[in-house]
Amino acid sequence: MSRNQPPKIAIVAGEHSGDLLGAGLMQAIAKRHPNATFIGVGGPLMAERGMDSFFAMDDLAVMGIAEVFQQLPKLLKHRKNLVNYLISEQPDVMIGIDAPDFNLTVEARLKKAGISTIHYVSPSVWAWREGRIKGIKKAVDHVLCLLPFEKDFYDKHQLPATFVGHPLADDIPMQWQQTEARNELELEPAVMYLAILPGSRKGEIARMAPVFLKVANKLAERYPELRFVAPMISEARAAQFRELVDQYSPELNIVLPVGESRKVMAAANYLLLTSGTVALEALLIKRPMVVAYRFHWLSYQIIKRLFHAPFFSLPNLLAGKEIVPELAQSDASEEAIEQALVQLIEQDNEPLLEQFTNIHQQLQVSASEKAADVVESFL
């Protein structure tokens, strides 16, 4: 960047979580460089910060092996056109946010063309397919890690990396009052609630909701005072879930708020959820949880051969030990999930919540500002 020219920064995000990270980073950079320009791919939050997306971010939000194959021609065309566009624009630095299968190739081609590259959100290379580190080193000048143990992995492989903390730890308050959340959601103030979070994607809900609803039926018999609430990401997913409730749990009294997942978790006493970022949100909101997940059978055959981390849920990975029950595939039976939830309901959870607070404090280090510090070093 010439000292007389405002920085031009390329950012490529592939899904909602990346859009959130990108918007926070753009805000932090713009405070230092009000005239900075941003190019690349982003969603609505990044658009609010001035990103004119090269193509729709949703085109990259493809999950599952079968789905990726179906969309492969479009993805390859997007990638080729994006690389050509970014090389022609010559940004001062390119930041790929998550979406490693797409972004690492883009980053490698830009780095070869002499453009500095940063990857924001470490690929889970520490958990499976460790051999990918060779490709990452060829593609990336610096990795921004959300989790503290990830930096140790990159240090071992001599790739510059910075632990920037997790933006969710900055966004979610250290104490989220249950009473306040219930009032805002118009839930009953003095009864016990179990929040059910079966995923945000259509396929996940189809796979997990029937299991979770059958567990809810059994818990309703055991605890007549227990109430149920299931936040949905959209009206379409709420309609899908309602059909499954009618099929599997027609007698169940369950509320389905749309777009209020964090508030619902704060309002609940206990949580039953799938793996992923939602488990980290649950930890930060500090509610006892059971994590259960069933993968598509083909995905599971691949994962079980390549996955080598001791846990699959973020709370346990961050703690370095099992602090929340996690049940996967055949272990995620209705009986096992019910038993884990009963134990959670019957036990004293204060020691668990103290561990959640300790982890929250470790992750709360102003992620967007620390990430912007690294970007600044490349300008």
Curated annotation (Swiss-Prot):
Q: Which residues lie in coiled coils?
A: none
**Keywords, A to Z?**
Glycosyltransferase, Lipid A biosynthesis, Lipid biosynthesis, Lipid metabolism, Transferase
> Which Pfam families does the record associate with it?
LpxB
* GO biological process annotation, one example: lipid A biosynthetic process
Gene Ontology cellular component terms for the protein in this record = membrane
Q: Which InterPro entries match?
A: Glyco_trans_19
Catalytic activity, as annotated: a lipid X + a UDP-2-N,3-O-bis[(3R)-3-hydroxyacyl]-alpha-D-glucosamine = a lipid A disaccharide + UDP + H(+)
Does the record carry Lipid metabolism as a key word?
yes
Q: For this protein, what is the EC number? A: 2.4.1.182
Give, as in the UniProt entry, the pathway in which the protein acts: Bacterial outer membrane biogenesis; LPS lipid A biosynthesis
GO MF, one annotated term: lipid-A-disaccharide synthase activity
**Protein family (similarity comment):** Belongs to the LpxB family.
Q: Function of this protein?
A: Condensation of UDP-2,3-diacylglucosamine and 2,3-diacylglucosamine-1-phosphate to form lipid A disaccharide, a precursor of lipid A, a phosphorylated glycolipid that anchors the lipopolysaccharide to the outer membrane of the cell.
NCBIfam families on file: lpxB
Protein name stated in the entry: Lipid-A-disaccharide synthase
Q: Which organism is it from?
A: Idiomarina loihiensis (strain ATCC BAA-735 / DSM 15497 / L2-TR)
Q: What is the name of the gene encoding this protein?
A: lpxB
